[in-house]
């Protein structure tokens, strides 16, 4: 029969401690502090002076962490212990420890009012150390007679074996594997100390993943499964730029943490220009990390669909064109064929000597096909067009509010998985989703639809950059806008040092980036809420001073209505902030200073090459949600 000393020597040490062994009489009557998370077992005999070993275990039913202190003596007889707090204060009830005939078991008997509660502690010769609460002698006997069941060290469920370095259940094994393989990034809504057990393990993925890693599950084990051994090859000089990436930290909390690190495939630091040939196009698409984040009220409405990328929308348009018999030139057919093949970027078309005018003609072809399809399937389209023409001469009174709760909620679902290295594809895809969401938001406003197709398209063409900039400010935290802009500036500086860009070009783009950053920061400082963002967008959308608009007086009335509702909301919601409305409205002129062409280069050239956003706006406004919602990103939590 093994002694307690032999058993204790096998316990995995987490810390060594000399624990005070006083408070013998008080400890037998004191109650356990319910708020204490960690407790200790201390020998109650004042004359016992032996070293002790400490192991932290977790009660799977309560999730409470318990420190078990085992006395190292040679007697092997029952010993009396006391449950105390980690600092030795607030002693609790007495525990009697005895060794079972089985060499791998030590029982800690806790007397209480309901009877004898048995705390069964398994020693390390059994693979999983754990505590089981046995309420009576019968259950104790049953537990001794049946084979010992291993418990998951993460949640306390029945373990299926050792996975990635720790004994876990199938659920925690799969969760850890998915999290590491896809490099998922979670957030904790609490204080990062959530209880993780069999019943609550799915409530906080962040704390569950942290617990997996803290209890010995190794990320490297999963990485080795999915990452093949790479054979070192000699790369030619012309492909060096395409293999460079920007490393982005996932725990960014401030602009100081947004410093980017440039590495190549062999992890050798070097720099390159992001702004040559449509700026960011030369960065390789790479890496996997995930972050699905939800902002604003959790309402599933028409304007909150999970939006696909700009390239996928164009692909959807090309697929629609296949159903029409419209004659096309060889150039247009080649472009449409390239789109239909599922290419994720149109930048390749520019590299294949396809000019922007040819791409634009292909879009014009798609527009004609869509118009033909609409005319053949909807007999009411002519009626809608005639009604729209009436608006050129008649001002329509708008009944009810301009915006309702559907238009206040503004949810952006980020691309998933998030890349380990910030790259052009992730930046452009994130921006395209924000652009789609802004377009779809505008289209969902009934007053906007009443303007007619041509007028509504003209409005969006004139103000899409303002709507996009407001969306960037609203989603700045979700998109890590500061990090993206910091990467832009860093690469601009490197490009200028290597004479890849003229100083005038660098200054122009840098000024634009700083204006955008200043605008986003000012909106964050004002703590603008969802209602205020919605009304600011409406005021920017219904601007009657853009050239080429028809029925300007009606558009002006819509803007006035948006302003009046905005004023009413701010007055009622922030009665003590007298100048809040003025401060918010004074941010709008800064949007007019944003250069739309530079915004296109920075955020969209990586997906659509030299195609201008203005040429794509009509198709986005004309499409149904189902047409560009083909890729379900997943529900944001």
From Swiss-Prot:
A molecular-function term among this protein's GO annotations: RNA polymerase II cis-regulatory region sequence-specific DNA binding
UniProt KW Transport keyword: no
Pfam families: Hormone_recep, zf-C4
GO biological process, one term: cell differentiation
Keyword Repeat (UniProt): no
Occurrences of domain NR LBD (ranges): 383-624
Source organism: Xenopus laevis (African clawed frog)
A GO CC term assigned to this protein in UniProt: nucleus
InterPro entries noted in UniProt: NHR-like_dom_sf, NR2C1/2-like_DBD, NR2C1/2-like_LBD, Nucl_hrmn_rcpt_lig-bd, Nuclear_hormone_rcpt_NR2, Nuclear_hrmn_rcpt, Znf_hrmn_rcpt, Znf_NHR/GATA
Family recorded in the similarity comment: Belongs to the nuclear hormone receptor family. NR2 subfamily.
Function noted in UniProt: Orphan nuclear receptor. Binds the IR7 element in the promoter of its own gene in an autoregulatory negative feedback mechanism. Primarily repressor of a broad range of genes. Binds to hormone response elements (HREs) consisting of two 5'-AGGTCA-3' half site direct repeat consensus sequences.
Protein name: Nuclear receptor subfamily 2 group C member 1-A
CDD domains reported in the protein's UniProt record: NR_DBD_TR2_like, NR_LBD_TR2_like
Keywords: Activator, DNA-binding, Metal-binding, Nucleus, Receptor, Repressor, Transcription, Transcription regulation, Zinc, Zinc-finger
